Amino acid sequence: VKSARAILRAAFFGVATVVWSGQASISIYDFSSQLNDRFANSSSFVAYAYNLSGIGLDNNGQWLTMISPNVFLSANHFHPSTGASVTFYASNDPNGLSVTRTVTSTAQRIGTSDLWIGTINEPLPNSFVYYDFATQDITSLGQFNSSPYKDAVAFIMGRSPTGWSTSQDMAVGCNKLDRWFDSITVGGTTDDAMGAVYDGPSDPNFVSSEARVESGDSGAGMFVPSAGGKLTLVGINWFQYTAGSETGSGFSYVGNYDGQIQSFLNAYSVPEPSVFGTVAGLVALGWGFSRRLRKSSG
């Protein structure tokens, strides 16, 4: 993998003060609503086989990806604010079952990264999913090259060019994870990052629905399919970059912060409402919630 570090120009995006009309939609090669819009509710949707009910956009257009029934990940530079309202949909049907929650003040930046972790006021019902997240430490190009994520084809979430209502403004593209950035500084944050080059159709790494993040996509999740038809949350959209003639997307890699994420989950995660009655008595006896108690993204 060639290094773009020395010549990288990273474009920090998704500033919270940017108005709705200034937020660009995700770039997807040969975009079509039926193929790429979640709420077109089409069987040809690129992520049709996967459950996206644990992904939400708040009323300000900021992203939440659930990692427990009440805990979410987002981007530090563009995260949901306390009191924001967010709607989650149980399916890709825009008229189907949905629930609305409020973002609480129990939230924090994860270390000095661009990751943000927070909570909603009430757990999602058990008909909604949350996602397992990457846990492998990757701190060098060599470790990335030997990891399961090198050249994996990822699903990249972003805003749609179609013009949906805010809570349904979700499009999905794909890209091959083929870049690693050591200690890149973007918008005042310095961290390692995973990357995906935005290739053209003639490039050998080009994939169908090839995608690149844009300004409205900060804080959305980047997922890699895992065993059993589930999705693993591997990254959170952080930046877009240009290096010579190359452009692409950069993601905060979740796996390097799994310990801090799990500590937050241990402190603040609660089970979905359906299990409150059966475990309430156990809580007083030191019962600890684990994000692995039920399947997470089937």
For each predicted feature, which ranges?
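Bacterial N-terminal signal peptides that target proteins for export
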Residues: 1-11, 274
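Sec/Tat signal peptide C-region and signal peptidase I cleavage site
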Residues: 20-24
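Bacterial N-terminal signal peptides
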Residues: 9-19
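C-terminal membrane-anchoring or membrane-association module
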Residues: 288-298
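Catalytic-histidine neighborhood of serine endopeptidases
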Residues: 68-69, 73-112, 123-125, 150-152
